[in-house]
């Protein structure tokens, strides 16, 4: 599970280490490693805000496209959400979306 820059490492662990599941919330730099997506066989759950200036929508759309044929991938995009939408105490925190994304990650991990 990676938050912000940890999203990149969750993706890489899934690709290189064979973890049982991977998740990222407002995960940055995943787009740098999309060439490794085809090596990922575990369930993944990635969550992004469409107003996140740290992760351009072009990158989010590329991530979504890279996982299009993955049978156990959830790539969620939350309208109106910025970076740190799931982090309590941050200005961009949205409690409802934080709960939705957290529940999705838990479902992903339970599916392993």
Region spans (language model):
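N-terminal cap/leader regions of alpha/beta-hydrolase-fold enzymes
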Residues: 1-112
